């Protein structure tokens, strides 16, 4: 079901993930699209919400959703509240919007011209930490990093991927050497 948010935004099924936000009309660059609203929570509460979503996702992947937005070093915004249509913006490695902190409020702002019917996305900016693999990216962009990461962390991901490939190649070489040594035939003279 499609649902109009305001004069320029529409929520509908997304090819990226579940629901997404789409342009109802052409939108110019640098336009405030919508405010991200929610309940102010402590970092501890935020972690508990995320843990609960992860544990629920073990049995049902559709339950693996949180709408936590970092506000500052002490607090986050839990956007899983009625009326927060901004929670439906999906991540993309090639976004056409960004988030903007302004006077203790979070806005989603276009960063280029957006065509009518185009899905509006922003880079969620997750950090490259121990759980980055829990956040695979499905944006489909040509420059997709494969994981939902801040663009600044893509070089770290590339280095880690290269190191993993090198280790795998070394392990494979060692396995092949061992197989060749163990499987060598010696000829015995009668």
Where do the protein language model's features map onto the residues?
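Catalytic cores of histone-lysine modification enzymes
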Residues: 2-99
């Amino acid at each position: 079901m499609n649902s109009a948010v305001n004069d320029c935004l529409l929520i509908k099924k997304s090819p990226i993930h579940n629901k997404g936000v789409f342009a109802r009309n052409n939108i110019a660059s640098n336009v405030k699209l919508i405010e991200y609203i929610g309940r102010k929570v402590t970092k501890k509460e935020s972690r508990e919400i995320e843990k609960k979503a992860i544990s629920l996702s073990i049995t049902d992947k559709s339950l693996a959703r949180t709408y936590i937005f970092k506000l500052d070093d002490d607090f986050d915004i839990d956007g899983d509240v009625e009326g927060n249509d901004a929670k439906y913006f999906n991540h993309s490695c090639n976004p056409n919007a960004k988030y903007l902190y302004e006077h203790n409020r979070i806005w989603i702002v276009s960063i280029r011209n957006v065509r009518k019917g185009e899905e509006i996305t922003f880079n969620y900016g997750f950090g490259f930490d121990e759980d980055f693999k829990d956040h695979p990216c499905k944006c489909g962009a040509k420059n997709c990093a494969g994981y939902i990461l801040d663009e600044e962390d893509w070089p770290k991901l590339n280095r880690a991927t290269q190191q993993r490939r090198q280790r795998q190649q070394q392990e494979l070489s060692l396995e092949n050497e061992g197989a060749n040594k163990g499987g060598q035939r010696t000829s015995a003279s009668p």
